[in-house]
Amino acid sequence: MAAGPETDAVVAGMACKPARMPIEIRVTTPDEYRAAADVFRGALLSPRSTDDDWAKPSIVDSWSDGHSVSAWEGARCVGHASAFHFTTVVPGGATVPTAAITRIGVRQTHTRQGVLTRAMHRLLHDAVAQGKVLASLRASEAVIYGRFGFAVAGETWS
């Protein structure tokens, strides 16, 4: 068994994983948007964003319009989640402030280590502090988010 990016040694035929640095969950700053975007795109198996992508004001604006948290291991972004500011019409016609959660991703090297859980907890905590009454989520893997209180609200079949 050879040592690779996830191993630092081979001892008696067993790969040994290196000790991980602590992971910090924090609000994503504008100069960190691109690193966060690359984590999200990687989670979707999409190519990294390009300089041309970030030259478009619409791309930069889309990252500035909401609230974003990222997981950092040292200087490397390893996870991300964000929420757009939104309003939802509820029964009776009232509108309530909503956190429209999106752009969730974790690097493959950091899955199943609590990165998503910590990022979602921070994002939802921040949403409450910002006065959001609801949180909505459109996910490709809806079952993952049940532990945060989300469930399928409807299905469309044709």
Predicted regions and their residues:
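Conserved active-site alpha-helix within GNAT-family acetyltransferase domains
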Residues: 129-133, 138-157
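A broad, structural surface signal
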Residues: 34, 38-42, 117-125, 129, ...
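"Short basic amphipathic alpha-helical interaction patches in structured regions
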Residues: 96-97, 118, 151
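Extreme N-terminal basic, low-complexity initiation segments
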Residues: 1-10
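Short amphipathic alpha-helix that is part of the acyltransferase structural core
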Residues: 14-85, 91-100
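Short coil/turn motifs at secondary-structure junctions
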Residues: 86-88, 109, 142
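Conserved acetyl-CoA-binding loop-helix of GNAT-fold acetyltransferases
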Residues: 103-128, 147
